[in-house]
């Protein structure tokens, strides 16, 4: 299978919410570059959509062994996949996804584009917000390789952005210390902090900015 054929299968899977066998299980070993090339074609095949941001996945090193990955990934978010709720409450129709899961998020909006070809750019923030992402696996039982995940668009389903907050000079440090608890039916399922996100959410943005320079055909932030 070539990149076009793989992208067609992925886009059909997403459109129909129908899972497929991971490409890595079929002996199709993609390089990181090839996987991002597939994801770009997938985005085109899913139809015209304004890209409004990037999601960063697998930023928590503590789960890398669970999913057998060894680095974060990213994928585009479109105007149709992002919703806003100042009340911090939002109902999502899960029938549009294959095997959805929920992840609490720190959402950041950049005031300006960071310098592209540098390891430690200044990150200028416009606002921050709590949010949650519905991540989705087109591969059964969430079993896939790193490049399988990249090819599917970084496992992005949808993002809900909560109430926006102003930023200050202390925001980067404060986000490292912020705590979050995830409940289901009133029962605590998981706890974490901003430090789980590649040592801090703004550190994750710097990682993304660097990563985009290392992969061909990627648009800067």
Predicted segment positions?
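Catalytic-core "active-site belt" of small-molecule-metabolizing enzymes
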Residues: 2-206, 210, 214
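Beta-rich strand-turn-strand
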Residues: 215-220
